[in-house]
Amino acid sequence: MSRLRLGLQRDWLTSVDSAMIPMSACTRRPTFDRLSAPWTNQAVGRRGSRAKTAEVAVRVLEEDIVIVGAGVVGLTSALTLQRLGRSVVVLDPSPPGSGASFGNAGTIADFAIAPVGSPALLKQLPSLLFDRQGPFSIRQGAMAALLPWLAQFAWQSLPAYSANNMRAIAALTLDAGARWQGLAADLEAGHLIQNKGCLYVFNNEARYQAGRRDMRLRQALGVNIELLNPGELAQLEPHLPQVEGGGAFFPDALSVSDPGHLVGLIAARAEADGVQIVPESVVRLSAQKRQVVLQLGNGQRVTARQVVIAAGAHSKFLADQVGDLVPLETERGYHLEYDGESDRVRRPVCAAESGFYMSPMAGRLRVAGTVELGGVKAPPTPDRLAFLSHRMRDIFPDLKAASRSWLGFRPSMPDSRPVISESRVGRQIIYAFGHGHIGLTLAPMTASLVAALVQSTAPEVPLTDYRVNRF
């Protein structure tokens, strides 16, 4: 069997910092943005144009398993499959873990079972969509393209559907902490995993009572929650301003002090175990009876027995090519970082009414979150970053300006459930995308389910709720 010999060996443990967008870049297109199909990356410099493809002599290489996407889901799947005796190649034009896997809030959130769409959100949706200063917004230029997705999102926000979606998500999340602790021990990365829980803060009594209703639903599905009054909240987080509402503490939740470094360790271990990580794009995908053919941005053609699509927000481009017209959209996620401010909070704290986390990380405080619908092509929205900055000044008036900012892309399904499924063409193509806000949380479980699909063994949970053709 031939092996791909395309890429330079990289230091996966340090390269992810290049994905940061400086504050001065907030009004221009980020250089790491994968701007259009073909699925490529400007910084890597490979663009799968027809002109370039025509200039390169096509070579056909044969592989066992190709995983498209070197985020945390793709890499944990690669590591799992390689250890099952399969031969795995990972393709991604960007450095491993440099997308949403890098820029998230760092929570391993067994409690994060509530879908984005809910009856409460549905009531507020018309006003939220046009509020550039709120926690849920939409880029106006993307409205027409988003209408079909928004219609499905609204439908999935109805009470019965929202409840079913919560149950489906809970089936994947409730042992997330134990899975990550096992993986971290294997990676000798236990020092990156913090066991201090996570906290929701409600700033007034009305929001606290609404939050209590949500927490009861989560408790019914097995989430361990402690409801706090303002005094108890102040004991846990003494540097936060006093609130009139209360809090919800999730004692079993874990957090990661440096998500980018953790994913880099997974990549390094995968390579040490024999996985080949190749910095290349996939521009075309076609399924045949016993194999899948991938055309790469450099003109090479690869055939594989099986392909796993784990390309996050960029997965739709490839799924569409084999007839799986999945309703995947992009939530544009932002973060700000404040160097030297990690002591402001002791654990990840979510300002519930604003939809963002304050997460203490190695040498810095990361403020991450909110939802902006609008695709991967547009530059960062200054209003989104200003929203985070202003809210942080409300909480900590003495806080200095942010050290840096970042924009990344979450893969979002209308029902907030991931797609973990065979393709319509069969087991030659497996999907593992659409994890929304909880890709980090669900990566080890998803890897186990991907392995079951690839190997035709019984999955740990039934996969009907996550099939690609459920819409």
What is each of the regions a protein language model found here?
Residues L147-L265:
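Rossmann-like flavin
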Residues R83-F102:
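Glycine-rich FAD pyrophosphate-binding loop
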Residues D64-V89:
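N-terminal Rossmann-like FAD-binding beta1-loop-alpha1 element of flavoenzymes
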Residues G106-T107, A112, V116-Q156, R284-A287, ...:
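Active-site substrate-recognition segment that forms the wall
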